[in-house]
Each structure stands twice: as C-alpha cells, then as structure tokens.
Amino acid sequence: MKLSEFVKTEYGKSISECTNEELYYALLTLTKKMASGKQHGNSKKKLYYISAEFLIGKLLSNNLINLGIYDEVKEELAQNGKNICEIEEFEKEPSLGNGGLGRLAACFIDSIATLGLNGDGVGLNYHFGLFRQIFENNMQTTVPDPWLTKKSWLTKTDVTYDIKFKGMTVKSRMYDIDVIGYNNTSNKLHLFDIESVDESIVEDGINFNKEDIKKNLTLFLYPDDSDEAGRILRIYQQYFMVSSAAQLILDECVAKGCNLHDLSDYVVIQINDTHPTMVIPELIRLLVERGLEMDEAIEAVTKSCAYTNHTILAEALEKWPIYYLKKAVPQLMPIIEVLDDKVRRKYHNQAVYIIDGEERVHMAHIDIHYSSSVNGVASLHTEILKNNELHHFYEIYPEKFNNKTNGITFRRWLLHCNPQLTELITSLIGDGFKKDATQLEKLLDYKNDEKVLKQILEIKSAKKMELKKALMEKQNVTINENSIFDIQIKRLHEYKRQQLNALYVIHKYLEIKAGKKPSTPITVIFGAKAAPAYIIAQDIIHLILCLQQLINNDPEVSPYLNVVMVENYNVTWAEKLIPACDISEQISLASKEASGTGNMKFMLNGALTLGTEDGANVEIHELVGDDNIYIFGDSSDTVVERYAQGSYHAAKYYNENAAIKEAVDFITGEELKAIGDKDRLERLFNELVSKDWFMTFPDFDEYVKTREQAYADYENREEWVQKMLVNIAKAGYFSSDRTIEEYNRDIWKLED
C-alpha cells in the first residue's frame, strides 16, 4: 500500500495536509503492518540471543530500507513537500542499551533476520535506559531518558510469566519489537517488563528506592552498583530476564512437541556476556521441575548454551557473593552448588571453581563449564583468552574455544547513515554489496580514478556540513567544516583512554600558544557517557569539557584547534558523526579492548584509523596494510608482561619526560582551575601520576608523533582520499552478516 493511500484511510487527508508528527505515526503503523506479513524463520532449531542490552537506535528509516521501500517513501513525501529527515525527528531513540555490547546485539539480530535464520533476541524493556546525559558547569549530570510512548515499535503480547524471588512473586509481561531483515524474514526482539513498574518513584536525577523491587525492576539499565542494594538489584534484574526467557523457551519447545531430553535439537541459547548467565541454572531447575533427572538436565542445557566473552577486564567478569544470591534468588543456589561440586570432583584447580574461597559465584565460570562453545570477538582477544585470562579453562576445554570477529550491519552504518556514499558505490559496482559486503573490494579498481576520488571527498565535505548543522542546532556549537575532524566516540572508560586524547589536546594547545600552528585547523570531537559510580571517568569528562571551554574561547587558539563533546552520545549522534569523520581514534591500551565495532563503522565511511594494535584494529591493519592506517603504542605482549612483572611506575615517566609533565601539570594549572572544579582536576592529576593503570604515559610520545604524521598526510588530499577508498573497499569483512554466518556454521547449526 502506498503511503498516500494509507494516510487517506488513517487520517482522511492527503500527505501534504498532514503534520510531520501524523506522518511519523502513519509510517510507524504502516511499517509494523508490513512486518507482520513477513515470514519468521521456521527451522526446527531456534536461536535465543539473550542480552542485557540492545542498542537498536531509531528504527523508522532502517525498517523502511530493510523493507525495500525507503526510496519510494522518501520520493512520495518529497513530492508533497515533506522531508523524511524532519519526520524522523519525532521518533525517540529506544533507551535499551549503552555501549558496544548493546550495539553489537542490535547488529546481530538485524543480520540474523537478513540471513533468514530462526532466531529472536531476548532482553528487558528498560523505561529510562542508562540515563540521559546533560552537561552543567562542565560536568556530567544524569536524568532519566524516557522513550516509551503510547504508539511505538513495541507491541504488547499476551505472554506473561510468574517470576519467583525470595519472599515474593512478580509477573513479567512480554513486549515485542519487529526485527525486519533486509528483503527477507522478520524476527522478534522479546523485551520483558514487570507489570508493577512505577516510573514515579524516580526522584532527584536518577535516584530511586533500590529495594522497592516490584516498582523499580525495569526502570534503568545497569542501576548504580556502588552499594549493596544496587548490586542486589542487578541480580534481581538478571534473574527476571533469564527466568522469563527460560520459561518462554520451554513453552515454545513444548508447543512444537519437543521432548525436553532433546532440548539441544530444538534450542540454542547465545549468552551475550555474563549478564544472562543465570539462564543456565534456571533452565536446569525448570527441567528438573518438569521431570528430568539432574544429570540429564545439566547435559541438555550444556549442549544448548553458548557463551560469548566480551572482556578481559576482571571487574567486568561478574562475581556475585553467595549472600546476595540467597537474598534474591535462593532457589538457584542448590543448582549452582551441584554445578560447582561437579567441577571440584573433576578438576583439582581452584582457578576453575565456580564458587571461590571468598564465597563468591563466578558467572563466567558457569558459562565456560556448562556451555558447548566459548568465543572471543576478535582474533587477538581470543588468543589472549586462550593464553592468559582463561588459560586454565582452555587447557580443559580446547575444543570449546573459538573466535568470531565482530561485525556491523551495513544497512544502518552505510545505507542509512551515508546514502550519498551508498549511491556512489552502487553507481560504480552495482548493489550486490548490500547483501554481500565483500563485493566492496571492487572499489579498488577506482583507486586512481580522479573523478571517483573527487566525489568521495565531496561526500565527506557534505557530511561534515551536516554534522556542523546538527551541532549548531542541538548544542549551539560552531565548528569549522574545513578542519580535520578527529573523533573518539565510545563509553568512557580509562582503558579506552580518552585521557590520552585529552593530554594530546593539551599538548597541541600549548604548541599553538607557543606559535606552532597546524597547517589545517583541527576539530577534536568526543562522545561518551560515564557510569554514575565511576568517579575518575566523570573527572575525565570534566577535563574535556573544561578544555572545550578554554580552547574554543581563546582567540589565539580557536582558529586552529577546537574541542567538542557531544551531549548524550547515542546511536542517533553516531549516525551523524561517523560519516563526517576523517580520523578515527581507537586508542585503547593494547590487550584491553576485546574488539570494538566503532572502528569498523568509521572505516566503512572512509575514516582512517589512528590506533593501537588492539581488538579488531589488528585485523583492520592486516586488511588495509601499513600505508592506510596509523598504528602506535606498545604491543599487547609488552603490556601483559608489564602487568605481570609490576614494572610500570607512572611517576618515573612523569618525572623524566618533559612533554608528559607539561601536559599533566596543565590539568591542575591556573587556566583550568579558573573554570573547573579543583577537587576533580587534582584527583585526576593524582590518579595519572601515582597510578595510570592503563599506561597512558608509555604510549604518549609515539601517539603524538603518529597523530602528527596523520595530520601531515592529510595535507596531500590526493593520497589521503586513496587511503579512504582502500579502507571502504576492505571493510566488507566486518559485515555482521559474515559474523552471523560463522556463528551459525560453527555453533548454532540452524537449518535453512
């Protein structure tokens, strides 16, 4: 049905007579109707992809693209004087995720549907997400980020489950969002909500009574865990998610006539990081309730589950005190104790026990022992898991460990966010790359085509102008569209080293003040949220915002250097920032970033990577070659060795390296103290000089040198655009379609 016909039926008027808001809701309704007519994957075995977060972004344009009607709708609107981008402004971005974990899950469910596989996502329906970030007095403040409206992509279902906690039973309700594949099937994202949730209990900022479980359970993603009540709330949340998921899985199996002894013939559960780990003991418990012997239930669940590890950071591998579990979900402890006892009888190595000597349950250990597959998300990450972090487990289960390098959906990160580049590529090599991204390699035939290279530069300039306009409209910030756009966008964490970028900004500021001006102006853009309980991360944001105020208001410096931090960074911002970027900052401490996917999105849109040999940067480097990437810093082996020997002392670098000392001293100097918070700046200074746990200082000199080389190379626009083209052409490997094909081939084994 054409939009004009639908609008006539819905509102009794023409497109030109409708408001943009009416048109948005008409398109939403029409899209949902079309999705409901699409076939769902229907193989005997079904995948359940369980994740605490799904950072899906706005859905309207992406769904129209995947339905194959975007151009038609855009044209029909334009003929009636309407702009689809303005209509899209009425859509609220779903607050269902935060960082790379959630964005990966969103890309994966898109690819699962596109490949026609029988698989649904399962998560929670957060009302306020992580939080909405607001900058006040050069500091991050947090407020709820509501997104639910009466008409939305959510569809309320009749599916409800009783979830039993200690001393109370609550009811979960399932809501569905259609996951529309590109010209293929439509699957579901199942989001569970608690029936008794009460948004009114949120008071100042994002504060609420953490012990009022019936009212607070699905309000926020990752509630503040700086106190015991917050940590126990996370257990309630996780169990609520997995118990709902487990009951759904068993109900759907029984409806298909499945013999529960043969669960793995019908079900595969992908556990995305450790947040859904409790699905393993919960499924075992439910199977025993339904008549299976304990050993049978354990075997059935182990064969059905697969675990993806996303981190080597010890703090992110969840370990819950037994006391917490007994307080919230005591029914799981007998199962967990059986699982631990089996491990202890078989392996006499405390490093692999589920329950440690401090009476804590290691969630990742449950996943590894009682799943059939354990995968890392980039080749380097998987090798580090096998040889270092999870080496004891690798010795026991070498056959379980495998690598699945992450990927991104090109439908959103090229077709949707960069239609101009998509159109150019299509005109050169056809549209086969939209379903087979490796076809992008055909672009290499145009590496010396001056006309094509000129068009690529023109598209980049146009995307810079779009970003300039967005920053002016949203934040009243002016940037120079003719400057180098140097961008770092990712959640704020010390290992991602936004502090290293900030130290470079200080270094550059001082150079300009001393009279050394860059050939081309530079705009350094940050986007990041810091967890409310992560004080140093908030201090780093404070430093960046102080630098923004200082530099942008300095008439000597601002013509040559600007700093911008986008407020409330999310998918919508990423879709504007990534196509406009020249230099992609991927500067995590080597060995600490599992993969990263921002690096892939930037590469696909023609940005050049400035990064360490970490995560997927390693594979980008291998694909594009030394001449088309900027690599610096210590190797992962050097970093791991330094940690093992305890041989790194930040103060030594600070005292012996004049450039480091000058930049770090500036943090507590008079210029920043005049506009910043003295305590925050001094705390960050002390953290760097006394600890610098993520080794900013050892990489500083080489980082400065490599970044300056990238800026120098930018001056040769002919060679620079050739590097851009190589990056775009080589990005095809990082399609999430390829990643999902590998998961299915090696782990899930879903039939066509």
Predicted features and spans:
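A conserved ligand/cofactor-binding region detector
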Residues: 1-752
